[in-house]
């Protein structure tokens, strides 16, 4: 499938998404599969979380648009999903949800040799981030934290 065809299909699907206060985050057409797979990742225009009902409501109108466009002249499987969870923790909700999970903290300490810390997310306040490193709580001033990401521990 060429780029123009994919672009046309994405434009048509954006119109349908708009009717449901959604937008197309990405559209992938996997032509190396049989039948081909049309993967649509949607997100809400107001930044709320996508529910299974949102995906379900979008499904039939998306099928109609694809079928009526005649851009795909073969059988296909349609997959509609949300973006999922980002590894990077940014919102207060993220920090509450993932308390106790392993995190990688990227530091902004210019004069220090330590650029990353790994531990369990313990607490976040407006002034500091606390992580549990091998049973000891380390408080890091938030102005020294560049990024906090979920990770996996390998002991």
Curated annotation (Swiss-Prot):
Coiled coil: none annotated. One of its GO terms (cellular component) is cytosol. It comes from the Bacteria. Belongs to the RimP family. This is Ribosome maturation factor RimP. Keywords: Cytoplasm, Ribosome biogenesis. It is found in: Cytoplasm. Pfam families: RimP_N. One of its GO terms (biological process) is ribosomal small subunit assembly. Required for maturation of 30S ribosomal subunits.
């Amino acid at each position: 499938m060429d780029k123009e065809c994919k672009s046309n299909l994405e434009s048509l699907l954006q119109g349908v998404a708009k009717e449901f206060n959604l937008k197309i985050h990405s559209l992938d057409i996997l032509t190396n599969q049989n039948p081909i797979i049309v993967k649509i990742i949607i997100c809400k225009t107001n930044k709320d979380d996508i529910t299974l009902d949102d995906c379900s409501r979008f499904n039939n109108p998306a099928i109609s648009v694809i079928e009526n466009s005649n851009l795909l002249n073969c059988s296909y499987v349609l997959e509609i999903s949300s973006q999922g969870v980002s590894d990077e923790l940014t919102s207060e909700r993220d920090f509450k949800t993932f308390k106790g999970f392993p995190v990688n903290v990227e530091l902004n300490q210019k004069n220090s040799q330590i650029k990353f810390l790994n531990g369990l997310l313990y607490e976040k306040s407006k002034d500091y981030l606390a992580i549990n490193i091998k049973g000891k709580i380390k408080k890091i001033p938030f102005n020294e934290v560049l990024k906090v990401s979920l990770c996996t521990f390998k002991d």
